[in-house]
């Protein structure tokens, strides 16, 4: 059976892992790194993913996409504020969805995330020596139904069979508790690049049971970065009367500098942010520079409200689990943003415990996802592990007066299924529209609409007579399926989903084909680059041989030099057929030259030996020795 992998598709960085000998192991990428930046850049027909994309971001800000996870499965009206601070163009798409415009083309967030997944899987396949198709992908525990579906679709667009979508804190708990014995109540505090989750689990005898989960999908390390960006921009504006945030290139440099400063302040009390030539004076065209010193105290002042926001989900998770802080045995920190000293301090204040830092906050989620993949595939080394998760938000339907009728409360164990009977409000009503909602507010307008389901073909009956059976079914991925039928007549009617933020089946199929075509184009482009590089490397070797074998026959040297010169011109021309011809000519010239050079050296060696022998003969002196007495 081919290996399955676990993937942490993160806001800022992503990680892939698999089971090796009963233990989860991170798979390094093609660059040799254990984490891959969740960054995708578009340059003409070429797509760059990971560190190579991040490195060129400042020069290509409009087409370098990052933090796309913040937009996946979201409605435009939910992300306007976040969209406005990006150096690239984020806009409203069909049905109120989100689209990212790059070089005149609109991309769905799922497409961009699929590029990251494709890179992770391609690199892992190369490392493992086998093609990977099966994966468990993690999502923040507080992701709603649309965001989970969109993440699953991203996997499908990348050509993956998504075995399961699991919550990030739950995955981290799997990694933490895999080899631990005894019973524990664990609080996982997961503050990543773009989202924040708190999950409380009970661990014991191979059972990982989630008691409660809470979170904030609009809070993460990028928000802390943004406070530094705004501070730097305001400081610069006061001095030069120019807002750097309006210049995409300058904004990209600010974002990168802010992230570096935040990381440095985790280990230092202050840091210097230096950005020479950040922009030009619009009147004099002289270069302007930015240099500021940021202290840890100032950073905590800038982010004070964000730090306060991490408290409420912890308190809510404890309340929902009906536990107090003293009932928690261990506090596990997950996500790179938990390295911020103020965050650690707040966690300790709330829980009264020193956080357990035994797991790598960047890798724990992917490692746990790999464990889940192993469980699904029946890895004998794992034994009997049972994972019991919950749905993070209440699911319900809209009823008369714009109220919400809850169907499945938050923190219900999944999979879960619930059926309720509804009826009509008017006589002879031919159909009903069922609005499916997710959230905790009592009024429908204040919650997220997951979709509108129309049940049509109800026979004419007085109001209140029809019995409309609505069933909510949440699968193990936390994804909701809704069915409805009219019981009185015994007839069933079809349901169609309208106005959802996720892609329909035809969109996914189209994007899968596009991704496959892009992958083929990328392969051909990579082959062209490799051929060009191989020819150039051979040219350098040829010049080296000419340097080392100066005593070789002149005609052989001339032929090799001419072939090397043609190779140089072919590389510059970028003409495939010319490159192939030049490669053959240079290989042939190299063989001929090496043969001629060896023959020449052997002849020289032979002549040298003969001369030496002659000398020995010439040096013989005839002499009569007088015998010793």
UniProtKB/Swiss-Prot annotation:
Quote the biased-composition stretches of kind Low complexity, using this chain's numbering.
595-614
- What positions are modified (Phosphothreonine)? 195
Taxonomically, the superkingdom here is: Bacteria
**Is Phosphoprotein one of the keywords?**
yes
| Record field: transmembrane | none
The residue ranges flagged as biased composition, category Basic and acidic residues, are 555-590, 615-629
Task: Supply the induction statement.
Answer: By stress conditions e.g. heat shock.
Keywords of this protein's UniProt record, alphabetized? ATP-binding, Chaperone, Nucleotide-binding, Phosphoprotein, Stress response
InterPro entries the UniProt entry points to: ATPase_NBD (IPR043129), Chaperone_DnaK (IPR012725), Heat_shock_70_CS (IPR018181), HSP70_C_sf (IPR029048), HSP70_peptide-bd_sf (IPR029047), Hsp_70_fam (IPR013126)
Looking up Pfam families in the UniProt record yields: HSP70 (PF00012)
- Where do the segments described as Disordered lie? 514-533, 543-629
Write out the GO MF terms: ATP binding; ATP-dependent protein folding chaperone; unfolded protein binding
Q: What does this protein do?
A: Acts as a chaperone.
Among NCBIfam families, the record links this protein to: PRK00290.1, prok_dnaK
Q: Which family does it belong to?
A: Belongs to the heat shock protein 70 family.
Annotated protein name in UniProt: Chaperone protein DnaK
Lineage of the organism: Bacteria, Thermotogati, Deinococcota, Deinococci, Deinococcales
